[in-house]
Amino acid sequence: SKDGKIGLLSVGMSNTTQEYSLFKPLADADAAKSPRVIVVDGAQGGQAAIHWVDPKAPLWKTIDERMKAAGLSARQIQVAWLKQATANPAKDGDFPQHAKVFQENIVKGLANLKEKFPNLRIVYLSSRIYAGYAKTPLSPEPYVYEEAFAMRWLIQDQIAGKPELNYDAAKGEVKSPLLLWGPYLWADGETPRKADGLIYKREDLRDDDGTHPSDTGRQKVANLLLNFLKTDPTAKSWFTGKLSKAGAR
């Protein structure tokens, strides 16, 4: 319906909730955001990709509570931002093995998301920020950079018609939402990214572990996500509530 709510859910681990909890007030205060869009932080500390594989995991109850607190039902969750990683990825081998394990876990998590939120139509995929300052094996380079390939493979597999990622009821049982690229958050430390000059300084990551974002790192991601949702051709019409001229015909 034209006045129905659009639940926008985050899916991911500690970094994701830390960034999304800064994105939410930023988005809610932005005049460009449609009042129909309700931002809900489903991401949770310690809940890396493998934890979303179990449909009975405690994390789902937490999402349910947060969703209800935001005044939403499961059927109103229509869009998600999935930013995931593998905890201690070295255990899964070198590239591409660890990225394949990561991809398989996300596929199973997506099936659970679609089952629990039947009107979840789009999931925007992001891999994590630079991890070259990491002091622990939790989520270091080069694994973090390489995890973006799993996101690419997910999108490619869906385009290729893999049944476990089918989003089109005309082609069989729907197992997944539509997968689209979200904002790409990685940049090579202090080397400016060609597209937009993005860098990550040491102070953009926390002092203690160099793995989780500091307040400045969180702000960078929140800004990137908000800008993406306001400008991406697949997102801006529902996020701002303004149909493009093509869509309004």
Regions found by a protein language model. Give the residues of each.
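Aromatic-lined carbohydrate-recognition surfaces of secreted/lumenal glycan-active proteins
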Residues: P118-S127
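Alpha/beta-hydrolase-fold catalytic nucleophile elbow
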Residues: K83, L125-S126, G182
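Short, well-ordered beta-to-alpha junction loops that form the rim of enzyme active sites
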Residues: M13, S126-I129
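Extended catalytic cores and adjacent scaffolds of nucleotide/polyanion-binding enzymes
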Residues: F95, V123, P137
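Sec-exported extracytoplasmic/periplasmic mature domains
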Residues: T16, K24, D28, A32, ...
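Well-ordered, non-membrane alpha-helical segments in soluble/globular domains
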Residues: K56-E65, P96-G109, Y143-E164
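Conserved SGNH/GDSL esterase-like catalytic core that processes O-acyl groups on lipids
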Residues: K2-K100
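Catalytic His-Asp segment of secreted/periplasmic serine-dependent ester chemistry enzymes
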Residues: I129-G247
